[in-house]
Amino acid sequence: MKKIRPLTEADVTAESAFFMQRRQVLKALGISAAALSLPSTAQADLLSWFKGNDRPKAPVGKPLEFSQPAAWRSDLALTPEDKVTGYNNFYEFGLDKADPAANAGSLKTEPWTLKISGEVAKPYTLDYDDLTHRFPLEERIYRMRCVEAWSMVVPWIGFPLYKLLTQAQPTSHAKYVAFETLYAPDDMPGQKDRFVGGGLKYPYVEGLRLDEAMHPLTLMTVGVYGKALPPQNGAPIRLIVPWKYGFKGIKSIVSIKLTRERPPTTWNLSAPNEYGFYANVNPHVDHPRWSQATERFIGSGGILDVQRQPTLLFNGYASEVASLYRGLNLRENF
C-alpha cells in the first residue's frame, strides 16, 4: 500500500494539551472571540473544556491479540490515547466532547448480538466473543477527520468489513449496506431526552455503497491502543471508514443489513443540505457553515495554540479510493 504523507512531530497532540487549567482559561477568555470562527458544535465543546482540571477517566479495556501488518505500520504520528478516549462525539451520551467518557459507563456491552441480514444467502449472528475471535484482528493506524474540521491519528484494531460480508454471501441484488446502533434509552440518555441527544432521531443509522463497504480500508473496529474499545468510542464494535468524515463511523452496532436501495442515514435525515450520504473528506467542498479547506490537529498548548493543517482529499487516501468515485460529481454528491 502506498505510504501516506506522515505528520511531523509538531503535529503530535501532547498529553498535557487536552484540557486547559482554570487559570489558563481565565486568561483565554479575553480573546475567546477567536473561537467563534469554529463550527457551533465545536464552540460548545470548547466551553466544556472550561469545567475543571480533571479529565474524564476512561474504562480500561481488556488487552486484545492482534497482528501489526507492515502495510499498516504508518509513519503517522499518533494522537495520545487520552485524547481519543476523552474527546468524542457520541450524542447518545451527550453533546459535549467530554460527555461520552463521563456518561457511557452505563452502556452494557455483554452480552451483545450483531445481526447480518438482508440481501444475503447466509444471514448469521455474531455474539460478544465472536467480535474479537471470529476474524483475525490487526492494528491499523488511520487518520480520523471530523466534519467539524478537527482531526486525529488513531491506532484502531479490527478486521476488514469485507470479511464479515463475504461470509454472509451477498446476493446480486445487494447494492448498499445499512448499519444500526443499539437502541437502549435506559443506558443511552440521549435516546431518551432529545435535549441531551441533540434532537436526532434514534437509533442512529448509517450506510455505505456495497463497493465502499467491501473496500479493504473499511474496518470493523473492536479496539484501540491495544485494548478493547471503551464505551465512549463505540464499544463493542464500530465502523471506521478513514476517507470519510467521522459521523459515518457508526458506533455500538447491532445490525448490518444489505439492501437494494440506498438506506437512510441519521445526519442526512437531520440536515440534508449539510450532511450528505457520501461524506467523503474533501477540502474543495465546504460545509455550509464553515470551510473544510483546513483542519485542527489538536496540539500542545491548549485550544488557543492549536495549529491548522491542509485537509487532504479523501483524508489522504485518494490513491486507494478515488477510483470508487470516477465520473461522480463530488460537489453534488457530498
Swiss-Prot record:
Top class in the EC scheme: oxidoreductase
Coiled coil: none
EC number(s) reported in the record: 1.8.5.-
Main subcellular localisation: periplasm
Pfam short name (any one): Oxidored_molyb
A GO MF label: metal ion binding
Positions bound to Mo-molybdopterin: 88, 91-92, 146, 181, 233, 238, 249-251
Recorded GO CC terms: periplasmic space
Cofactor section: Mo-molybdopterin
Gene3D superfamilies in the cross-refs: Oxidoreductase, molybdopterin-binding domain (3.90.420.10)
Post-translational modification comment from the UniProt entry: Predicted to be exported by the Tat system. The position of the signal peptide cleavage has not been experimentally proven.
Family: Belongs to the MsrP family.
Protein name as annotated: Protein-methionine-sulfoxide reductase catalytic subunit MsrP
Organism: Salmonella arizonae (strain ATCC BAA-731 / CDC346-86 / RSK2980)
